[in-house]
Amino acid sequence: NDIYEIYTTSSYWNAFPRSPMVIDMNFMGDNYLIINNHFKCCGDGILDTVDTSDEENRRYTAINLLKEYIDVNLPESNVIVLGDLNDDIAEDPPNNVFQNILNDSTNYRFADLDIAMGNSSEWSFPNWPSHLDHILITDEIFNGSNGLEVQTIKIDEYLDGGWSEYDQNISDHRPVAIKIINQVPSYDINGDGTINESDILLLVSLVLNDDESIGMADINQDSQTDIFDLILLTDFLQNN
């Protein structure tokens, strides 16, 4: 629908060395506002709310400005705030720059909090083992979905040179991804109230004929009807 930046004027440059970018998009009939960020790096781990040059304070100010923007402008919207936020969401107060967000658990949730609190092998920044890349979602998403899947994507494990090759040629951060499950999967492809071989035959026909019909045939909700939907359907029939 639209792509634009917010907090672009000079008065916000201290908090946002890179202005947040908003993507307004529709997917599977739902509207989402995705706010991409790259917060100020570094610091000494101590949040000094008096010193405006303090790196932790700059990140603290940035996340609270984003919260204010969402609360005022997008109070009923499906909002995802993500990016390299350059700080630890699992840090103890009073030095957790995200504490105001964490305290407002009715309206906000870090989808990757379990990763941040878990084993360091799943963290997004291996060079100085820490989890700095986050996905924050609003209550419209976590209350309105049927499930969430979040994981750090270890592309380096698929490269011959491993982490060294990835770090040198791609990034020093691993991406963090989220899958939002908005609907309970339906295996009744033909809509006759029964799940059986006739549903497999119809789905095979759709796949072979490259039919782009979505509807109930898109079992995994990836906006395509393909072999992966067929695998899910056959697995369901074998197990039920």
Where are these regions (language model features)?
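Structured beta-strand-rich core segments of catalytic domains in phosphoester-bond hydrolases
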Residues: 1-40
